[in-house]
Amino acid sequence: MPLDLQKIFTYPYDNDLLMRKQKSIRRALLAREGTGYIDKRIAVLCGSTTDDIKNVLELFLLEAGIRPQFYQSEYNKYYEDAVFGNSELDEFQPEIIVVFTSVVNILDAPTLGDSNDVVRDKHDAEMKRFTQIWEKLAARYPSAIIIQNNMELSYETGLGNLDTVESYGMTRFIELLNRSFSDYAATNDNFYLHDLHGLAARIGLSKWHDRFQYSAYKFAM
């Protein structure tokens, strides 16, 4: 039975189907007649395992008429590839660079009882590290677009509701770091944020909110 590409790429997406039928969907997309593709070289610098993300990204790009060629860093080698470079990445000459990091890549998170000054120093150290990544990439590949994830909230909050109040709370630290990422994006060309924080929240909120219940009974949650 042929795949219904229009249905597959109409929101809301069937995530299970996209994951299970990646190869079949890719073949069907490339077999479309009369489709002219724009070729793009995309480097994915990984802070975690990104194979499935890369594969699904390829499907959506192909559906949009973009045929990607990928460079993928080794696991958790995003910093080394960005700051020190390597010959394979240089030869690839990426047009788009995705720095795919998340909360697990924060190296020095606040700990219980850290003073305001210590927390600020930890924030500044993280920003210095990421700014170094962005500036090195921009200098080495000046025509490339850089896309950086911001940080989603940590799954566990050891301080409960105080996690967003105390300066050493992880939630407050992530919010501070995300604001700094946004400030950098607002003042630098060819640099864009991917709102991983918002995406994670929407996935969570989709399980929290029931629109039918609100429309029918005004239950807000």
What are the functions of these language-model segments?
Residues 2-36:
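Short N-terminal or domain-adjacent regulatory/targeting segments
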Residues 39-55:
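Catalytic nucleophile-elbow at a beta strand-turn-alpha helix junction centered on a G-D-S/GDSL motif
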Residues 12-14, 76-79:
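Compositionally biased, intrinsically disordered low-complexity regions enriched in proline and serine
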Residues 2-4, 30-39, 56-58, 63-73, ...:
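Alpha-helical cap/lid subdomain in secreted, periplasmic
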Residues 1, 10, 14-17, 45, ...:
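Non-membrane alpha-helical secondary structure
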